[in-house]
Amino acid sequence: MTVSHWQRAEQIEREIDFLVVGAGLAGGAAACFAKQVHGRDVVVTDARDVGLGASGRNAGFMISGLDTYYHRAIEGYGHDVAREVWGMSLRSFTHWREFIKNSPFDVPIDNSGSLLLAETEQEAKELELAARALSKDKIDIEYYSRDPLNRGFYAAIEQPLDAGVQPYLLAKTVMAQSGAELIPNNELYHLEQMEGFVRVHTRKVIFKARYVMLCTNAYSPMIDPYFIGKVAPTRAQCLVTEPLDHVPVPYCGYSDYGYMYYRSTFDGRFLLGGGRKQNQREENDTAEDRLNPKVHAFLDRYLKRYFPDVTAPVAHRWSGIMGFSCDGLPLVGTLPGKPRVGFAVGFTGHGLALAAATAERAVDKLLNGGSAGAVDVARFERS
């Protein structure tokens, strides 16, 4: 990101202890862990405001695990890593539910679970293999060799520990409960590692911070070149209908290997997202926040095909920018040559599943050293 000479006219200098960059779910969680677990004096800053990025634009799915079926995660990462990351998602859910329980305002959550659905016979075979692997690890699921919704799907896995949440309000309550000072609308444009501190240049303030934690996900490559090739901004698109007189899907629904997703909202509407698989050239590797007419035409067709009973008109459409990791796992570490700058980024569309536990490990690694386990960027040095 850049800031003009004129925009720095009111810039001040300030010395602080622990700076979190990014006021989404990961940033709010990092602020909580840094302040409440490690006793740091925390300031959070963001180019916009709390929850205005992907944290407040996603579908609100708390779905366990990674963005690939469990048996494929075992094949790709090894059994130990797949099991560890699954556990991280459950730990994140525990943190989110605790924040919701202690929230000073209502944060809606629906604990009815999720349903992973197969759109083809081939995907049904994949779901069966995933179900076997999950059951072998004694993970609580139920497998259906048919479509439990009677909507033209081929098979399903029900994950009862999953949930749907209002993600924007969750981001707001996490930040509120962190106790950190917030400086919004404040773009970061330069980082310098000095002796014993980091000089952080932002539009409003030049911070002299003892520690910096980047929770900037999709926008990380714009902050430091280290992230180029490691985190790719990727656009997602959603729509929501006018209120309905029925509930089409009593779960968070997830199909076509996660490319399509749908749920009922807390105000009785139907939310549908996806369409990126059919438009990857335009939707991948972009941070441009805009609607893609091709994607939304596909979503409209999909709605009619699988949910013909949803006849209410579309009320709203939007997009959000996800941060896709180069290997599908979140990234935790410190910047090369900047040992006091840590990061927790690259959630690959699964920030609600992984952001809290990842931020927890990232803060501990920055302050105490040691390994962040499966999400530590040291894995790239070993490969």
Residue ranges: model-predicted function:
Residues 57-88:
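Glycine-rich active-site loop/strand segments that organize a redox cofactor
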Residues 68-74, 98-173, 195:
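Flavin (FAD/FMN) cofactor-binding and adjacent substrate-gating region
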Residues 247-336:
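Active-site lid/adjacent beta-loop-alpha segment flanking the redox-cofactor pocket in flavoenzymes
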Residues 191-270:
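Flavin-dependent oxidoreductases
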Residues 1-18, 36-37:
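Extreme N-terminal leader/targeting segments of oxidoreductases
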